[in-house]
Amino acid sequence: MSIGQERLKRRMARGVEFLGSEVAIMCGAMSWVSERNLVAAMSNAGGFGLIACGAMTPELLDAEIAGTKTLTNKPFGVNLITMHPMLMDLIAVCAKHQVSHVVLAGGLPPAGSLDAIKANGAKLICFAPALSLAKKLIRSGVDALVVEGMEAGGHIGPVSTSVLAQEILPEVSEQVPVFVAGGIGRGEAIAGYLDQGAAGVQLGTRFVCATESIAHPNFKKAFIRASARDAVASVQIDPRLPVIPVRALKNASTESFTAKQREVAQLLDEGKVEMMEAQLQIEHYWAGALRKGVIDGDVDNGSLMAGQSVGMVTREEPVAEIIATLMAEAAHALEKRAA
């Protein structure tokens, strides 16, 4: 083992122990993409796969977890959206299958959800978009945090990964394992965040074009062709409708989302829907638009959620090779620093 590999192993030890994987690299949960095939491939290759529950019903999640278990006996997790109207039922499905790790995304854990997850012995991971929230989540009993910057694909916050990492890691990384996400495409960046105290990292965009990913060939081609500047954040058109920005490749669906926002804002105005229902309508819009892109391969009208690291995705390759490349780059970077 080289000096770089030895250093990398040492820096990833905490994340590896927490996840039960061989390397502290999680595959970010991406709706329609992060299903049994990619999740199992990720865990089988030594990383940590996450099922994206998204808008799934409890029955669908039940089948997806069971399906994943037929493809891997390694640990994997499930990512749940906090605003899902059947969140507690989804947590029960995870418990039934003894899922080892549950990620809650999209806001603070609703009352009772945290206890329900922990009661079944699962480890709970939450997103911390600010230091104050990170501290609050730790006090409430969360087992680990993901710090994700605005470079990420899909739903994003307003602050960059590098700034969030500098703000949050020195303050909380000794209390709980912290995984850094957003805009990571190479191992050198992984090494940098590990040096700052991260327990590991989470990448999504980098794994979309994995051979094992079921994303449509057109969807993968769009990623391989795209550069960082093509992955743009959606614009909020009505301040009364608090829509979380979404980063995706520019196409016709970018425009249709603006129209959808106007339509939902009007329904709010006319008192035809409550705020919670309005936000759910937006989420269902994304679920449908993503399906169009990922599954149907309609890259003009479907959503192409992608992070700014998309320019570093240059070909289709197996998950194991992507992980090996990232680990080699990270080890090389740490070796150079030792010199």
Which residues does each predicted region cover?
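Acidic, glycine-rich active-site loops and adjacent beta-strand->loop/helix elements
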Residues: 150-151, 182-184
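Residue-level detector of alpha-helix initiation sites
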Residues: 33, 184-185
